[in-house]
């Protein structure tokens, strides 16, 4: 969790990474459990082989997962998700259920895979030059306030996640749950696919070092 990152040294590691880019990392404004994103699909999935032949769309950040699942990929911008699902251009798409509800995905989607993956991705950076001009006591206050916000948001998110999932069911979306072994495989495809994408985009030592620090 975001709070754990502040306790085990990962937060400081990320701060130093951001500084190299001229930024100061304050924290995660959407601190969540590791099932922030879900997959919307219009074909029932019951076994791993059912992903083969599907066309899954979304940002390039999800392509590693799609490839690990055995599906073909389509790059889409977020405003295209709803219309692409409605017109059958794609068979499925990854996004948070909050964003999915906002863009109307429940209206054009038959199924939602109930096993979520990844955490909320937004971060809160500050220009490093600006940060360095802020008095130290105010810097400390901002860091402490952000840490407290992450704890409160985490609890808030857990409740909102349950409510939003219920709203999807009430809208007629069937929630699919896999057997334990298939669930494990599905989550591994998401996690390892994400690292595949990161390594491809940022070759070198940074990603392996980050993976070693933040994975359990």
Region locations from a protein language model:
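Short glycine-centered helix-capping/turn motifs at secondary-structure transition points
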Residues: 9-10, 88
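N-terminal secretory/targeting leader peptides
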Residues: 1, 16-216
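Extracytoplasmic "Venus flytrap"/periplasmic binding protein-like
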Residues: 1-9
């Amino acid at each position: 969790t975001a709070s754990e990152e502040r306790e085990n040294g990962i937060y400081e590691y990320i701060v130093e990474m951001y500084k190299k880019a001229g930024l100061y990392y304050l924290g995660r404004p959407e601190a969540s459990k590791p099932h922030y994103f879900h997959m919307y699909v219009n074909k029932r999935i019951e076994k791993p082989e059912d992903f083969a032949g599907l066309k899954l769309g979304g940002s390039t950040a999800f392509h590693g997962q799609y490839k690990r699942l055995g599906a073909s990929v389509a790059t889409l911008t977020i405003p295209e998700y709803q219309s692409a699902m409605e017109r059958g251009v794609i068979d499925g798409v990854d996004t948070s259920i909050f964003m999915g509800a906002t863009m109307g995905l429940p209206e054009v989607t038959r199924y939602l895979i109930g096993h979520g993956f990844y955490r909320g991705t937004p971060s809160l950076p500050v220009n490093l030059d600006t940060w360095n001009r802020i008095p130290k006591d105010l810097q400390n206050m901002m860091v402490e306030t952000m840490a407290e916000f992450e704890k409160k948001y985490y609890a808030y998110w857990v409740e909102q996640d349950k409510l939003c999932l219920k709203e999807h069911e009430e809208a007629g979306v069937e929630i699919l749950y896999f057997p334990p072994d298939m669930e494990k495989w599905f989550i591994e495809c998401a996690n390892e696919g994400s690292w595949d994408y990161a390594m491809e985009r940022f070759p070198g030592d940074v990603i392996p070092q980050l993976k070693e620090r933040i994975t359990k």
